């Protein structure tokens, strides 16, 4: 496994883990998360793919410029990465906000260069509309109730001034059974994204509505969610229902089915994704 750097046209540089041979698979972690958190999955999937796990701008080992913290810019970063590495066709896997980056990429650049998609636990639309029914709120995975909730979460990110406060912030994304001794590593990786930049990106992503993009996806797709996630399992089933022949896998709450099921039940997660990619 090696770490490579990709120089972007706006002057920033992205860092990525690279390993394996075969068709390229680009992995895009979620908000404040890093490629290092995916090492176990990277190693597993490298048996059948040339895996490139990105640190988005500001995240992990990537450069941290003071500009560009919008989902649209992250989609451009993904596009430039594919172009600069001269990858003719790629599989894409995103987690959380990483899915939104993929949806923005599809919206801007289409699907012709994408082989297969793995979409891991992101809501189609996190911010509600007043006229939506309770079923629609569940189907679209509305995480926020109002703009005040966005402000509160952004303030929570800004309040993460050290490792202890960051541990408290990330704890809510896991099931109660998740080993306490593993949280410091997750928090350390999370904290690599400067908090003022993290809050800026969080605010931009909060109001995205990706339903019309999802409904146009024609790539072979696996959707993964968790019963104990911050996003409803109904929202993951809705995504799968909108994409022809998409597969869906919902992890039960007692089997690590949190927003981070790929950490809590890595063996099952890796096995399911490998099975999908092989077929």
Tell me the role of every PLM-derived stretch.
Residues 1-25, 46-49, 87-88, 115, ...:
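Alpha/beta-hydrolase fold catalytic core
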Residues 12-67, 71:
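Conserved HGGG/HGGXW glycine-rich cap/lid loop of the alpha/beta-hydrolase fold
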Residues 73-90:
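Conserved acidic catalytic loop of the alpha/beta-hydrolase fold
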Residues 94, 98, 102:
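Gly/Ala-rich beta-loop-alpha elbow adjacent to hydrolase catalytic centers
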Residues 103-108, 113-157:
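Flexible "cap/lid" loop of the alpha/beta hydrolase fold
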Residues 128-129, 133-134, 152-215:
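Conserved alpha/beta-hydrolase catalytic His-Asp/Glu region
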Residues 216-257:
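Conserved loop-alpha-helix segment in the C-terminal half of the alpha/beta-hydrolase fold
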Residues 254-266, 270:
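Catalytic histidine-centered segment of alpha/beta-hydrolase-like enzymes
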């Amino acid at each position: 496994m090696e770490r490579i750097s990709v120089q972007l046209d706006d002057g920033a540089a992205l860092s990525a883990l690279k390993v394996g041979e075969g068709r390229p698979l680009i992995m895009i972690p979620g908000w404040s998360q890093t490629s290092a958190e995916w090492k176990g999955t990277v190693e597993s999937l490298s048996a059948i793919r040339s895996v490139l796990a990105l640190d988005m701008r500001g995240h992990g080992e990537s450069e941290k410029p003071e500009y560009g913290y919008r989902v649209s810019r992250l989609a451009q970063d993904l596009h430039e990465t594919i172009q600069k590495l001269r990858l003719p066709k790629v599989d894409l896997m995103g987690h959380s906000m990483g899915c939104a980056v993929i949806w923005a990429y599809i919206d801007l650049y289409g699907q012709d260069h994408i082989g297969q998609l793995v979409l891991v636990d992101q809501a189609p639309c996190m911010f509600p509309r007043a006229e939506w029914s309770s079923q629609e709120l569940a189907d679209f995975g509305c995480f926020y109730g109002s703009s005040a909730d966005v402000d509160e979460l952004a303030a929570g990110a800004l309040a993460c001034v050290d490792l202890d406060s960051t541990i408290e912030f990330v704890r809510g994304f896991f099931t109660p059974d998740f080993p306490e001794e593993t949280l410091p590593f997750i928090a350390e990786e999370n904290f690599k994204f400067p908090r003022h930049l993290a809050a800026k990106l969080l605010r931009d992503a909060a109001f995205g509505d990706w339903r019309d993009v999802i409904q146009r996806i024609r790539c072979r797709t696996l959707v993964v969610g968790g019963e104990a996630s911050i996003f409803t399992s109904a929202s993951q089933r809705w995504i799968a229902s909108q994409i022809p022949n998409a597969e869906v896998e919902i992890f039960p709450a007692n089997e690590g089915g949190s927003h981070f099921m790929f950490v809590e039940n890595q063996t099952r997660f890796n096995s399911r994704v490998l099975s999908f990619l092989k077929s």
